[in-house]
Amino acid sequence: MDPLKPPREEFEKFVAEVAYAIGIGEVPEIERSKRFGYFSAKFHKYRVDAGKLKETVDSLKSRQFKYLTSISVDGLYLNVDLAVEKVAELTFRAVAEMGDKYGFTDECKIGSFLVEHTSANPIHPLHIGHGRNAILGDSLVRLLRFCGNVVQSHFYVDDCGVQVMYAAIGYNVVKKYVDEVLKRTKPDVVIGAIYSAVNAIAEINRLKKELEKEKDDEKRREIINEIDSWVSVLKRLIDTEGEVINKLVEVLGQRNIVEEAAELNKRYETGDPEVKKIVREVVELVLKGQRETLARLGIELDSWDYESDIAVWSGEATRVVSELRRRWPQYIDDRGGAVVFRADKFVEDFKLWDVLDLPKFIPPVTLTRSDGTTLYVTRDVAYALWQARRGFDKVIRVISTEQTHEQAHVRIILYALGYEDVAKKLIHYAYEMVNLPGMKMSARRGQYISLDEILDEAVERSADLVKEKNPEIAGIIAERVGVGSVRYAFLSTSPRKPIEFKWETVLNMRQNSGPFLQYTYVRAYSILEKAQEIDLKKVAIPKEILPEERELILKVAEWPSVVREATRALRPDYVAEFLDGLALIFNSYYEKAPVLKTEEPVRSFRLALVNSVKTVLAAGFYILGIPTLTKM
């Protein structure tokens, strides 16, 4: 139920009458007015005389309107304001009838969706960048579900590839020590340290061999500096997990880890039972830790899709390569045993840029290594086919802009294989990075800020905000405020813009933050808790209302259109921006207008208005995943 639908329809009907009267064969579009009034219709493209437009409007506007007022003409704009008391009646009735589903309209029910998000490598904890991915993906799921769409959330477990094998090699060496460490440390943190240490050892071993062969003094100095940087990585890791890391150095110090990892990966792809056991053990440990982190954020996934099962052991990735060879041999190159698909030439020949929404530059793509093992893109094509077979209208993949070319390659290969429909319904939901001032991240070197660390600090800082008022439950409140602050910080910016993560913004209690919205909700809740129950359908609208009340009524009435627009555009940030605007108006109103100590009928009207604001905030919190609070 949309309170603004009847006023809009009444205005559209009037605009149609005006258009007919001045001889226009179509009805101008209605838009929100940026000039005068609430709605506007532009007559610019119809070569209408402004004087004739005004004369026609003046002759037609004298009749009685139910929802419209102040009809005027400004140049070639036809403007109208709304009878706010009538909009208030529509809004209160909609809130009363729909409750926490207020905002839903049939127009935002747009299909069925498979949403893949997070999909972090199972070799270390989720870091701050994964946090943006996970929260964006989860909020898309929530937004689409709020609108009645069928949605499934999926996590792609990338358990193949050399990176995972590095972690498996290290874990296999120190397995008996790890059990003790796991009693005090999250499993993803432990495996992350092992992975970084094995990387460091592998690089040191490789660089030492280079140093033995190098004769040039300048190049030798460069190699020595690089060795020193990797040694410093090991020292830092030893400071946290000394026994485990020292054992890795002792056992792996002289081994060719690069070759071992490649061989292990080949054995894993062929389904070697011994390798499968150790790799899956490592992967499950990391996923256990990652699930715990996601649970703190209120994120649950419907399906965990293992790359090995879907793309490799099924033979699907191999079939992708062989089918491309069969269909398009002229676009296949063999380079030292590796198979390369000339995606650049294929796109040029078939002019696919607009068809598949591709970036201007498309490089060739390598499908297999020289040893025959598949690469990420090949396996991802196999996964895309698996996703398509789930039968959803659209598949949304929340993946950073860094993988724009990889995701373009997936769509190109699907098209080349004859799956044009699959390629077109695959949406790469791209997002930019999260920047922490003064921090450069590298998972290989173990240099990253984990999502848990961000959440812990958010909770600690939030505790300082709430412990004075509610010391007995400060810990519970701080956790919910901390989670809300992080979720809002990642959702309040357009996905295509980088985020500069600053605590003074994230925890700003005056505007544009999760805690600000939560505090606004608490204010509304507290008023209603002290008041008697009211019948929203029978609230009398006062003849005189405050400017802030007018603003609030129209703002609350706009909620269904915001949800509709956010759903169609897949933009949770529209919801965040709207809630911030609503909270700013409400807090200004809260300071100026007493509610509980006001005489009737104004008291009931204001309570109905407060309840409507609270209802919208609660619905928005569900979509954004922000925890609600009754005390703060």
Curated annotation (Swiss-Prot):
One of its GO terms (molecular function) is ATP binding. It holds the Pfam family DALR_1. A motif ('HIGH' region) lies at residues 120-130. Its EC number is 6.1.1.19. One of its GO terms (biological process) is arginyl-tRNA aminoacylation. Keywords: Aminoacyl-tRNA synthetase, ATP-binding, Cytoplasm, Ligase, Nucleotide-binding, Protein biosynthesis. The keyword Cytoplasm applies. InterPro entries: Arg-tRNA-ligase, ArgRS_core, DALR_anticod-bd, Rossmann-like_a/b/a_fold, tRNAsynth_Ia_anticodon-bd. It is found in: Cytoplasm. One of its GO terms (cellular component) is cytoplasm. It comes from the Archaea. It is an enzyme of class 6 (ligase). It catalyses: tRNA(Arg) + L-arginine + ATP = L-arginyl-tRNA(Arg) + AMP + diphosphate. Transmembrane segments: none annotated. Belongs to the class-I aminoacyl-tRNA synthetase family. PANTHER family: ARGININE--TRNA LIGASE, CYTOPLASMIC, ARGINYL-TRNA SYNTHETASE. This is Arginine--tRNA ligase. The gene is argS.
